[in-house]
């Protein structure tokens, strides 16, 4: 998988001739300058590392670089007799000697930023008589995979950075990257259609790079790496993992485990819930009306007696008297017209008393109530001509109410007889 890695520096600035640390090594393969300045890999990600750690890392990298150089040079010098002998089979010697050197080459590229690869490939190009030039890591490995076709001349042709192959500056791009950052394959790095595909294919480059990662993971105990290199690899791995983190689950807080609305204590009974309408029976209403006609404000003793008689609570009796007084005040306020104020008050009281007597004694007071309902002003010695139209209409309604109440009282004659007896005694 080739993932695109966004670098902050342009390609021309990062891979210019001034930034190449070992550009002069093409003409002089083994003449390494003592003032080589090692730049830590991925310096844009390690910018916040302190200077002391960076200096320690640079010193360790210099020491490691020279150790690997001498180790690899000794291995190359041991087989120099076979490599430089023109009489022997160059292709066979190349196939026999290259795998071990290639394995070391990939490990040195992975851990030492591909400094030893330049020396090894440059040695091969100079001994084989190839054209001088900075070698390509992927091209050298690709020519090894092909099998060194054409003998020593094939190595020289593969290591020559020709116009059809990938540019030689690509080595610096590989040298600066560790296994943790992904490999970037840009359009300028891919070879043109006319170049050999075995020497410049990016798929071979990726395959060899992945094999180097696998070899490093399997043989990391056999490599002579300093602790600073391990720390550097760990830091780069942590930085790259932070850049490619998968979306984590949302945090699960403690309040999510609890119910949204905890159980609250039930509030006390309010007046709205406690307020209910009590429907009184006709007998209870008649007894309360008789008591109200006697006294508008009931005494405590009489309230208790009436509550026991009517099977009501003292609170209900008290509230009924309060409501009855409020009703009377409302009626008096409604009849506060100066023309009919006195008549309205007297008529209200008389009609209430008349209705109560009609319910108490329907047989005795029916004709009397009807007569007074038809002409209520005659009983009060008031001329009928001064009667207000509203009062006349109200008198006719009283007559209808009295007739209807008479029909209802006939159905409850048994109860009303007892109530009438109690009423006559109280009167």
From Swiss-Prot:
Tissue distribution of the protein: Maternally localized in an anteroposterior gradient in the syncytial blastoderm. Also expressed in the pole cells. Zygotically localized in the primordia of the terminal abdominal segment, the hindgut and in the posterior midgut rudiment. Expressed in the gut, the gonads and parts of the genital disks of third instar larvae (at protein level).
Positions of modified residues (Phosphothreonine): 245
Locations listed in the record: Nucleus
GO molecular function: DNA-binding transcription factor activity; DNA-binding transcription factor activity, RNA polymerase II-specific; RNA polymerase II transcription regulatory region sequence-specific DNA binding
Motif (Antp-type hexapeptide): 252-257
DNA-binding region: 273-332
Biased composition (Gly residues): 145-164
Composition bias, Low complexity: 116-129, 209-243
Family membership: Belongs to the Caudal homeobox family.
Protein name (record): Homeotic protein caudal
């Amino acid at each position: 998988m080739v993932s695109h890695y966004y670098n902050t520096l342009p390609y021309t600035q990062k891979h210019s001739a001034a930034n190449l640390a070992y550009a002069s090594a093409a003409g002089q393969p083994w003449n390494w300058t003592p003032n080589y300045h090692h730049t830590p890999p991925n310096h844009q990600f390690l910018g916040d590392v302190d200077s002391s750690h960076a200096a320690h890392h640079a010193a360790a990298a210099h020491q490691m670089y020279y150790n690997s150089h001498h180790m690899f040079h000794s291995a190359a010098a041991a087989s120099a007799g076979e490599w430089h002998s023109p009489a022997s089979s160059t292709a066979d010697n190349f196939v026999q000697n290259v795998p071990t050197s290639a394995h070391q080459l990939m490990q040195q590229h992975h851990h030492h930023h591909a400094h030893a690869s330049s020396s090894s490939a440059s040695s091969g190009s100079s001994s084989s008589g190839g054209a001088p030039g900075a070698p390509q890591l992927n091209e050298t490995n690709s020519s090894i995979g092909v099998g060194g076709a054409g003998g020593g001349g094939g190595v020289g042709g593969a290591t020559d950075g020709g116009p059809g192959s990938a540019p030689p500056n690509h080595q610096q791009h590989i040298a600066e990257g560790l296994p943790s950052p992904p490999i970037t394959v840009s359009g300028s790095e891919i070879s043109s259609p006319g170049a050999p595909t075995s020497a410049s294919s990016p798929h071979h480059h990726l395959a060899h790079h992945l094999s180097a990662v696998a070899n490093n993971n399997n043989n990391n105990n056999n490599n002579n790496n300093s602790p600073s290199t391990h720390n550097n690899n760990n830091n780069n791995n942590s930085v790259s993992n932070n850049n490619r983190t998968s979306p984590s689950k949302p945090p699960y807080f403690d309040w999510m485990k609890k119910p949204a609305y905890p159980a609250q204590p039930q509030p006390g009974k309010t007046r709205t819930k406690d307020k209910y309408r009590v429907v009184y029976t006709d007998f209870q209403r008649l007894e309360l009306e008789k008591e109200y006609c006697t006294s508008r404000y009931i005494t405590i003793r009489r309230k208790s007696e009436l509550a026991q008689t009517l099977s009501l609570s003292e609170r209900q009796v008290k509230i009924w008297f309060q409501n009855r007084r409020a009703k009377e005040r409302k009626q008096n306020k409604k009849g506060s017209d100066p023309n009919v104020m006195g008549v309205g008050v007297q008529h209200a009281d008389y009609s209430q008393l008349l209705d109560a007597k009609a319910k108490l004694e329907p047989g005795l007071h029916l004709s009397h109530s009807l007569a007074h309902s038809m002409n209520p002003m005659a009983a009060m010695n008031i001329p009928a001509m001064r009667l207000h139209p509203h009062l006349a209409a109200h008198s006719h309604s009283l007559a209808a109410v009295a007739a209807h109440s008479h029909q209802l009282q006939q159905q409850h004659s048994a109860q009303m007889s007892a109530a009438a007896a109690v009423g006559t005694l109280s009167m």
